[in-house]
């Protein structure tokens, strides 16, 4: 099990607090001037295809050593072993945490409750492979004998965000099948998705472990109604619906052949489930072989994370740097900025991955924490973000550490587009780190013929303080394997921070209260009677809603 160690009570935390008295005045320009080898010392590679440059951070070798000491004193290495060995580190749900087993390409035994889970994992993968090949090849036919052309994945949260993100990221590897994702219980989402589709050539994947998730099952029933309005016969449902679930009884009652039910296990958390049967939509989108490459890429990082000393461990380094800003510099958010349009949902995916995992205010002892835990995660692709929110990152009053991610090789070599994209990628981290001093601004104004009076009016607005920290992650090319690398890298970063913060990263009780209250409110919306059972605000809103729609 994970130890219950309050990080703020360790000697390392005290040392970092003392170190911060000096470190808060670090200047990146000075750090680079003082050390010509800074890039070499503060960058690392993962395999042949990924470079991680963390040299533009407000850290020195001393800072990093103190951070590594914090990891040691909170027994991070022991926690890593506990996760990989199948210990029930998700204590509040009494579960192991083994998304790593789903991509365990070495096939070494992984024991849960005395049983090796790998035979079951491999059996589901084989079933996914056969199903995928039948659909992609056109062997699988709909109820009128036509090939399936469109797949609609109906899920929410981890059953949607991960598959959608990966399918978009790997669009260059697309099969002949067209993928669609429906998540929101807002009827608009499914109505607009189904408008251009033909029931004869559409297959639905219903992704719900329990087959009871409100949003997913509401959309699933609407999809079935849409299908039957054309197909007529309930028996035809079996050829157009498959389930990613463990509830065979409910799946069968829905009309789905349980031979087309793909199971996963309670040791797979929703936000880590794209590696499981939930990833069936990915396999259909890009082909099963590419899905396996995705698993391979993640497994490479798993091996690195489990077997590499902390000082050279990429997820550990990224996690500790993030913690340095979160807990000592007082930053409240991190931005993920992929300079690759295919990665346009990457930040949103890790918004869930990070904020649902580490958005906790109670430690593993059950006590309220008195230190900061999970940061706010957000971001958009470059260069779009440059014309939206980079202003605040450059000249605002908040410190926002940023991760810049870009491929050296584009899937779309159109003119000089990629060179222009990458010139912006390189320029932004340089600008954020080093800024533009007043004397430079004045020199530019002078060269442009500005008078002293004109300069006095504008100089202050043109100065960039710099000293904004960034990581740069340069990928040779976004492939299934390198995407698997990246995803696993961020997953393990989240785990490391949760261990050090002494919180449980694999439950999500914070999502429950709103669902409970929604279930209580739902029957109150069935008629036009005035409601007075809630607080005055909620009563007022419900009654206004009823009045508006009357």
Curated annotation (Swiss-Prot):
Q: What class of enzyme is it?
A: isomerase
What Pfam families is this protein classified in? PGI
Pathway recorded for this protein = Carbohydrate biosynthesis; gluconeogenesis; Carbohydrate degradation; glycolysis; D-glyceraldehyde 3-phosphate and glycerone phosphate from D-glucose: step 2/4
Q: Where in the cell is it found?
A: Cytoplasm
GO molecular function per UniProt: carbohydrate derivative binding; glucose-6-phosphate isomerase activity; monosaccharide binding
InterPro entries cross-referenced by the UniProt entry: G6P_Isomerase, G6P_Isomerase_C, Phosphoglucose_isomerase_CS, SIS_dom_sf, SIS_PGI_1, SIS_PGI_2
Q: Which UniProt keywords apply?
A: Cytoplasm, Gluconeogenesis, Glycolysis, Isomerase
Q: Which catalytic residues are annotated?
A: 356, 387, 515
Q: Which GO terms describe its cellular component?
A: cytosol
Catalytic activity reads:
alpha-D-glucose 6-phosphate = beta-D-fructose 6-phosphate
Q: Name one GO biological process term.
A: gluconeogenesis
Q: What is its EC number?
A: 5.3.1.9
Q: Gene3D superfamilies under this entry?
A: 1.10.1390.10, Glucose-6-phosphate isomerase like protein, domain 1
Superkingdom of this protein's organism: Bacteria
Isomerase in keyword set? yes
Q: Which family does it belong to?
A: Belongs to the GPI family.
**Which HAMAP family does the UniProt record give?**
G6P_isomerase
Name the NCBIfam families on file: PRK00179.1 (NF001211)
What does the function comment of this entry state?
Catalyzes the reversible isomerization of glucose-6-phosphate to fructose-6-phosphate.
Protein name per Swiss-Prot or TrEMBL: Glucose-6-phosphate isomerase
User: Which organism was this protein described from?
Assistant: Aliivibrio salmonicida (strain LFI1238) (Vibrio salmonicida (strain LFI1238))
């Amino acid at each position: 099990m994970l130890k219950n160690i309050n990080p703020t009570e360790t000697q390392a935390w005290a040392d970092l607090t003392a170190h911060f008295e000096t470190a808060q005045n670090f200047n990146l320009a000075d750090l680079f001037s003082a050390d010509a080898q800074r890039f070499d010392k503060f960058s690392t590679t993962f395999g042949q295809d990924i470079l991680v440059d963390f040299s533009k951070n407000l850290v020195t070798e001393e800072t990093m050593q103190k951070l590594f000491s914090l990891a040691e004193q909170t027994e991070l290495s022991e926690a890593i072993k506990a996760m990989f060995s199948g210990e029930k580190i998700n204590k509040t749900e009494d579960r192991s945490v083994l998304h790593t087993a789903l991509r365990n390409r070495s096939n070494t035994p992984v024991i849960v409750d005395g049983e090796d889970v790998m035979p079951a994992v491999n059996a589901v993968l084989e079933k996914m492979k056969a199903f995928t090949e039948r659909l992609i090849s056109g062997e699988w036919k709909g109820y009128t004998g036509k090939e399936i052309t469109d797949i609609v994945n109906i899920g929410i949260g981890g059953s949607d965000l991960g598959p959608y993100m990966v399918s978009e990221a790997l669009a260059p590897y697309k099969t002949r099948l067209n993928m669609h994702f429906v998540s929101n219980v807002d009827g608009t989402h499914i109505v607009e998705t189904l408008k251009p589709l033909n029931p004869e050539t559409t297959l639905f994947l219903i992704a719900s472990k329990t087959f009871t998730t409100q949003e997913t099952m509401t959309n699933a029933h609407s999809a079935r109604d849409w299908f039957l309005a054309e197909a007529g016969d309930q028996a035809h449902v079996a050829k157009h619906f498959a389930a990613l679930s463990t509830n065979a009884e409910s799946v069968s009652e829905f009309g789905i052949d349980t031979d087309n039910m793909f199971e996963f296990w309670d040791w797979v958390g929703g936000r880590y489930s794209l590696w499981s049967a939930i990833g069936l939509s990915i396999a259909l989108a890009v082909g099963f072989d590419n899905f396996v490459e995705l698993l391979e890429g993640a497994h490479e990082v798993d091996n690195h994370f489990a077997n590499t000393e902390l000082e050279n461990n990429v997820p550990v380094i990224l996690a500790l740097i993030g913690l340095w800003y979160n807990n000592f510099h007082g930053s409240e958010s991190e931005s993920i900025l992929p300079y690759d349009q295919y990665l346009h949902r990457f930040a949103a995916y890790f918004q869930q991955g990070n904020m649902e995992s580490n958005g906790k205010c109670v430690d593993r002892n059950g006590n309220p924490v008195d230190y900061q835990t999970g940061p706010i995660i957000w971001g958009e692709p470059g260069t779009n973000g440059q014309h939206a929110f980079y202003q605040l990152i450059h000249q605002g009053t908040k410190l926002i550490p940023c991760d810049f991610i870009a491929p050296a090789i584009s899937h779309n070599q159109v003119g000089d587009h990629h060179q222009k994209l990458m010139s912006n990628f390189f320029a932004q981290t340089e600008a954020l780190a080093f800024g533009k001093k007043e004397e430079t601004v004045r020199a530019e104004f002078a060269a442009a013929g500005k008078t002293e009076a004109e300069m006095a009016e504008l100089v202050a607005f043109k100065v960039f303080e710099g000293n904004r920290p960034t990581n740069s992650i340069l990928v040779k090319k976004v492939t299934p394997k390198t995407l698997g690398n990246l995803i696993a890298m961020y997953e393990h970063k989240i785990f490391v921070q949760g261990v050090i913060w002494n919180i449980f990263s694999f439950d999500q009780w914070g999502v429950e209260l709103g669902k409970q209250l929604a279930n209580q409110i739902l029957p109150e919306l069935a008629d036009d009677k005035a409601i007075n059972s809630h607080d005055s605000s909620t009563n007022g809103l419900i009654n206004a809603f009823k009045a508006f729609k009357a």
